[in-house]
Amino acid sequence: MTEDVKKADGAAPKKLSLQRRTKTTVSTTAGGKAKEVQVEVRKKRTVPTDAAQKAEEARLKAKQEADRLAAEKAKKDAEEKARLEAEKAKQAKAEEAKKAQAVSAPTKAVDVEKEKRRAEEAELRRKADELARQKAEELARKAAEEAKRYAELSEEDAENENSEDYADYHLTSTYAREAEDEEARRKENRNRGGKNKVAKAKKGGREDESSKTERESNRRNQKDGKMGKGKHAKKGSALQQAFTKPAQAVNRDVVIGETITVAELANKMAVKATEVIKTMMKMGAMATINQVIDQETAQLVAEEMGHKVIIRKENELEESVMSDRDVDAELVTRAPVVTIMGHVDHGKTSLLDYIRKAKVASGEAGGITQHIGAYHVETDGKMITFLDTPGHAAFTSMRARGAKATDIVVLVVAADDGVMPQTIEAIQHAKAAGVPIVVAVNKIDKPEANPERVETELLQHEVVAEKFGGDTQFVYVSAKKGTGVDELLEAILLQSEVLELTAVKDGMATGVVIESYLDKGRGPVATILVQTGTLHRGDIVLCGFEYGRVRAMRNENGKDVASAGPSIPVEVLGLSGVPAAGDEATVVRDEKKAREVALYRQGKFREVKLARQQKAKLENMFTNMAEGDVAELNVIVKADVQGSVEAICQSLNELSTAEVKVKVVGSGVGGITETDATLAAASNAIVLGFNVRADASARRIIESESIDLRYYSIIYELLNEIKAAMSGMLQPEFKQEIIGLAEVRDVFRHPKFGAIAGCMVTEGIVKRNNPIRVLRDNVVIFEGELESLRRFKDDVAEVRNGMECGIGVKNYNDVKVGDQIEVFEVVEIKRTI
């Protein structure tokens, strides 16, 4: 019999385990052989000891003793404090009595007062004693609670120690039993031999491995148990991580301006840019990391990702500057602003010259208006301001910027020439701006004049005369003889009365820039038409991207003026730079703030220009529609003949559906002009050229404004491409690239090749095997291929820019001096939506 007893930290075990082992040998016969088998019988009994009962009694006794000691201590402290308070009160009373005896006998009234004071002092002392007693009781109660809490903690510690001792005891008992079993197995293996010995050794080896694994596991458990008890418990917990990862993303306040890139938005939300792009893809918007998105899209993305959005107004300074202006609320009648428009050489400037009684037309190059002239005249005590425009560029710019500077359009049509292309363009501009038209039929003094034909032709363009039941006034005039000029002025004044034109006269002025240029001696000069208020010399003017103080003002006759009221045009000096035609001019208070606003506008201009370049692209039409920016596809159609124009416009209108509409903004016959390009830029339109080309001035505007210009020679290709764009299925594009242009200087006759054109290559390279077109006055008259290309009697494959050559066009002999031969090649371009 063995007894396993373990004492840990001096504590007696609560139980005793008694083990008894009996070994016997049994003889058996198997297969005719006698075999001895050893049998071992183990018995175990656990007997509880008196140690547990004694420990429990000791714990209860310690708890009672601690409670008694704490109560006695609290009681003694309270009694001591009360005794000290009473002694202090007694001493104070004795001192008062001694002082009272030293003082001479007072009068009866004084004695009554002293008695009253003594009664009050006695009451105060009684209250003080009561307060001291309450404090002593409170202290005693707190001390008792602390003693009770201390006893409970002591009890918990004792229980923990007992449980630890019990665990250590059992762990150690297991090890002791395992060690004893191992020793017994080793003895058995030493006494055995042969196969049984080998078999038992193998079995014992497996048992050794299992027991070894068990011992290692128990050893780890024992080590962990020791680390978690006693003083080392806090150290073990201190080694653990003291924080956890947040379960959700932190919501932030995201400040968003008018525009922001995807990368900047991700940085403000403290997330990866890929997460922002994923969110945008889920919302149906495709974007790259450097793409600029608008404020509304950025707000939706940030709110979708759980952040709070703060909208920042970047133009807050501009709004504050514009709002800080004193404008008198009193409205007065103002003079009408009249724009003279019409075809070239129909007499616009001559008519205006006769009205002003000044010979200005002779001073202009070739009699053609080189710049905008702004003048005001008085008739019958009433004033009229006239604008004479070349090409209507400023008028279109004003309309594009929303500045309605013109009140009435006087459309000048020559009676002997009729309605011409620029006349139609002028009508389109006036209707787009919503301005009434007064038609002046000029040159009626000529023998071939036919004013009735002009009225009939204008009916086709929805300009209906009053005698036909319309609302458009027709006046027959002669700018040369002055016939009908007074009637024209009366018609203008009558139209202005119908419009009831009013403006604020007093206050800070606003206006629009009619024209501007850079003078070598005076610097930037801007002609400003005042619309409201009065412009004074010395005012601070904010004008588009420029600003400055008005140093001098001059009227149309070159005389200095101190102020200018509504509808008065003046030349202004003192701006920081040359503003653009159509910019709004505003008088502000602070020059420093005006400079800040001008710099802010300059910074925003680049972003607006980049955004505008993408809007008019045919490939991006559906993207813009998805964003809600484009509800219809604006188109300008120019063709070589009127029949093609009518057929294309009718076919495009038939393509319109309920979702996508094709709107023909303008159409006409002839080459693409500067006016077409300006109208396309203002109305965000695509220019379609059918057998026509754009001239140099139009190409400059198209390149600077990034207008989408497309050339076609087959109407079905034009319609199919527009149809493919509308259906969203853009096929691979075969684009015609012009690689060379040759100008015909002379024509020679050859017996074999027919007409040979002696040409000078003006642009690019002329190649022999490429297709060509013959242009006359920018209109395609033949399309084919070259039959021969020679230079100094030698056949060559190509001729470069600046060289002369002889060109023979196959199956075409009607080449004339001044024609242009255009060489192009067909290039396949893959489209992306």
From Swiss-Prot:
Residues 342-349 are annotated as: G1. Residues 1-247 are annotated as: Disordered. Residues 478-480 are annotated as: G5. GTP binds at residues 342-349, 388-392, 442-445. Residues 333-502 form the tr-type G domain. Residues 187-203 have a biased composition (Basic residues). Residues 367-371 are annotated as: G2. Residues 53-99, 110-152, 204-227 have a biased composition (Basic and acidic residues). Signal peptide: none annotated. InterPro entries: EF-G-like_DII, EFTu-like_2, IF2_assoc_dom_bac, IF2_II, IF2_N, P-loop_NTPase, Small_GTP-bd, T_Tr_GTP-bd_dom. PROSITE patterns: G_TR_2 (PS51722), IF2 (PS01176). The keyword Cytoplasm applies. Keywords: Cytoplasm, GTP-binding, Initiation factor, Nucleotide-binding, Protein biosynthesis. It is found in: Cytoplasm. Residues 388-391 are annotated as: G3. Pfam families: EF-G_D2, GTP_EFTU, GTP_EFTU_D2, IF-2, IF2_assoc, IF2_N. Residues 442-445 are annotated as: G4. SUPFAM superfamilies: Initiation factor IF2/eIF5b, domain 3 (SSF52156), P-loop containing nucleoside triphosphate hydrolases (SSF52540), Translation proteins (SSF50447). One of the essential components for the initiation of protein synthesis. Protects formylmethionyl-tRNA from spontaneous hydrolysis and promotes its binding to the 30S ribosomal subunits. Also involved in the hydrolysis of GTP during the formation of the 70S ribosomal complex. Belongs to the TRAFAC class translation factor GTPase superfamily. Classic translation factor GTPase family. IF-2 subfamily. NCBIfam families: IF-2, small_GTP. This is Translation initiation factor IF-2. The lineage of its organism: Bacteria, Pseudomonadati, Pseudomonadota, Gammaproteobacteria, Pasteurellales. The gene is infB.
